[in-house]
Amino acid sequence: MEDSSVFLLCLAASSGVPLYSRSKGSSRQLTFSVIGSLNGVHMFASNQDVLLTSTCTENTRVAWRAFHDSITLIVMSSESGASKLSLNRLLENVFNAMVLVIGLDDLVNIKNVERLKKDLRACYRLIDSFLLETEKMGDLTQCVDCVIAYDVPILQECLDNFTQAAESNFGCLMAGGKVVVATEKWWRLSSQEVMLLCWLVASLAPHSSRDYPVYLPQGSPTVPHRLLTFQLVPGVDVCVLCGPKPSLQKVETELIERFWKPVHDPIKSCLRVQMRSFPASVPLHHGILGLLLINRDMNKSLYTVQAHPMEEMQKTDLKLTLEQRRSALRSFYTLAMSRYFPSERADGKNTLPSEESFQSGFSHSAHQCYTISSSCKCYGMKTELHLLFLLLKPEVPTFSMRSIANKTIAAFTKDFPF
């Protein structure tokens, strides 16, 4: 495989017929013989009652996943940051994206392969967005990417009133695919459903309004809901999940102007914090290059690799490009969650087996971890409510990283609650 390339394959599990293939970083398509070999080894293992999930070669990692004994997804990646965790999350996201757009019934009960292939084309833009580097982390964390905007109380009140007038309880205001404010019922959807809805809206071509049928993978995988979206200003959309009523025209002509025109300036201000994810007034240590903050209760996150955008605009010799920062922070998150901060279910059991052998011998788990390289330092901290991952300049003293992390947590719990 070419360096930094990814291939995603979707096949009908029973027949092995390819339904689609998507790729990143390569102009070549996989040959039928390669596709057949990848699917064949998985089917052979399954027939021997062996669950084949992943393998790796010198420069490539492969992962398999079967869903409902109907759809098989295979991903091959030669990216340096590819891991078992990231590839499994990718396969989960891809299947749930398919459910979101065409529903579970057509995927579980495949009656016409050619028609299914045609229907799945509607998923391509959303699926492709999971293969690309973005300014979001929800695909990996399974949390909702958010921004802390100015005038949040005003926007929240406006959204609540607008959603109620649209005969719904599920409403959301997003900037660049990140949630600014949402109604209480919107937050009751699963975090993966909210993440998928945000990524769907961000992946679609800009439009003043849309009436889009969606299936909620966990809440309503077989019965569609209507997703109404309206572009308030370029880059800022308001979304409503509803039933047969009201009509798109009624909401667009009667409600949008009534509720959102008076708050035009606060809406535009959302764009100023979109890249950093929070206002410039949030105090951050000058050594921080990027951060990922996760609220464990709400399953929402703040993410940026432009912690000091105004300062960096004046520099032309950045030691780490934004793409390198994203890759470093994603890799550190994967390392920490796989080895030191395993996710926990409500019953207290780990959802991810720890890859570090010493974990199984102790009753406690790590609450802090760090890595050091020639180009950057990374620090992770786990508290009762939050997970924090920092990307720091290499010249930041190692002994000061804990203090920097504590001050960062304090800033987002006291001055700017998240």
UniProtKB/Swiss-Prot annotation:
Pfam families: Fuz_longin_1, Fuz_longin_2, Fuz_longin_3. Probable planar cell polarity effector involved in cilium biogenesis. Proposed to function as core component of the CPLANE (ciliogenesis and planar polarity effectors) complex involved in the recruitment of peripheral IFT-A proteins to basal bodies. May regulate protein and membrane transport to the cilium. May control the organization of the apical actin cytoskeleton, which is essential for the normal orientation of elongating ciliary microtubules. Belongs to the fuzzy family. InterPro entries: FUZ/MON1/HPS1_longin_1, FUZ/MON1/HPS1_longin_2, FUZ/MON1/HPS1_longin_3, Fuzzy. This is Protein fuzzy homolog. GO terms for biological process: cilium assembly; embryonic body morphogenesis; embryonic skeletal system morphogenesis; establishment of planar polarity; neural tube closure; protein transport; regulation of smoothened signaling pathway; vesicle-mediated transport. The keyword Transport applies. Knockdown of fy disrupted Hedgehog signaling and caused defects in neural tube closure, including exencephaly, spina bifida, and holoprosencephaly-like features. Keywords: Cell projection, Cilium biogenesis/degradation, Cytoplasm, Cytoskeleton, Developmental protein, Protein transport, Transport. Interacts with rsg1. Interacts with intu and wdpcp; fuz, intu and wdpcp probably form the core CPLANE (ciliogenesis and planar polarity effectors) complex. It is found in: Cytoplasm; Cytoplasm, Cytoskeleton; Cytoplasm, Cytoskeleton, Cilium basal body. It comes from the Eukaryota. GO terms for cellular component: cell projection; cytoplasm; cytoskeleton. CDD domains: Fuzzy. The gene is fuz.
